[in-house]
Amino acid sequence: MLNPPLNQLQSKINSKYLIATTAAKRARELDERPETALLSGYHSAKPVGEALEEIASGKITPVVSDEFTM
């Protein structure tokens, strides 16, 4: 079971795919630099879960570019 629930995450970020990519990027950052943690305590022991908790709390928001370049 996903914790935090998907509907709670989608109230912050509308797209499941954007949630996944945002969480993955943030999890990599947390894994490489744990001192960048934004919450005082996490329920999850893994970086992906911690990233999802940050998204659910509103601490992390994705930056989306409308520009397409090749």
From Swiss-Prot:
GO terms for molecular function: DNA binding; DNA-directed RNA polymerase activity. The keyword Transcription applies. It is an enzyme of class 2 (transferase). It catalyses: RNA(n) + a ribonucleoside 5'-triphosphate = RNA(n+1) + diphosphate. SMART domains: RNA_pol_Rpb6. Its EC number is 2.7.7.6. HAMAP family: RNApol_bact_RpoZ. Belongs to the RNA polymerase subunit omega family. PANTHER family: DNA-DIRECTED RNA POLYMERASE SUBUNIT OMEGA (PTHR34476:SF1). Promotes RNA polymerase assembly. Latches the N- and C-terminal regions of the beta' subunit thereby facilitating its interaction with the beta and alpha subunits. The RNAP catalytic core consists of 2 alpha, 1 beta, 1 beta' and 1 omega subunit. When a sigma factor is associated with the core the holoenzyme is formed, which can initiate transcription. This is DNA-directed RNA polymerase subunit omega. It comes from Staphylococcus haemolyticus (strain JCSC1435). The gene is rpoZ.
